[in-house]
């Protein structure tokens, strides 16, 4: 890993921040991207002090020109891109027709189009050298949907399909040096719920069980070294994914009931919340969200 050039989007918190720290300790050269510029610069300083060499590039991945500029900055600064991690993501929770359409659009533009943009510019660079690892962060909801997450699930289904289609293209054209990995985490204790827009009328709560996000952080670094096509992180997700192949109706009904209980029936009433969909907010600046009891 030493001296590899790694681009990480969504680096101001959650999986992206954790992965950046791990990559820095491995001696990589990092290009850190997110909307929160102050947090990016703080993280870059931290990474520079722990063995890596990092630069901060404030980026809104829903804007194609900013993602293109991010890729160009990486090449200009370090000469190439070896690994690209598409982690930036947002969510909007609520009954589909009660969430503002502008919020659904923003979820798709950030989660799906942002991943498409990053994948496109990363692969353009990889193809020039016939080498590279693309790691896209999807979700277990990209395999099994849940109520109140309609646009989020749609975006993550799209990310899963994107990775599968690109891998087919690479295989059919016998391009063996480029790898596309899709990570599908179960509910993880990240700041996701600090940032997600919430129109359920209840306090946000993850669908249990809730896992330590360090599992995903570790998986990202492992995939950069030893790529595999798809991986679900969280034992419950692995079991549910297999069961869904044989009894999709039963598993989707179970997921719906679990979501209804955890996020509506057992959750205190709360006002609507716009979250960080359209503008970044200060809350949720670490890898963990603090909702999981150790």
Positions of PLM-derived features:
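Conserved glycine-rich cofactor-binding loop
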Residues: 12-13
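Substrate-binding pocket helix/loop in short-chain dehydrogenase/reductase
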Residues: 95-96, 100-108
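Active-site helix of classical SDR
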Residues: 119, 155
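Residue(s) in the substrate-gating loop at a strand-loop-helix junction
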Residues: 139
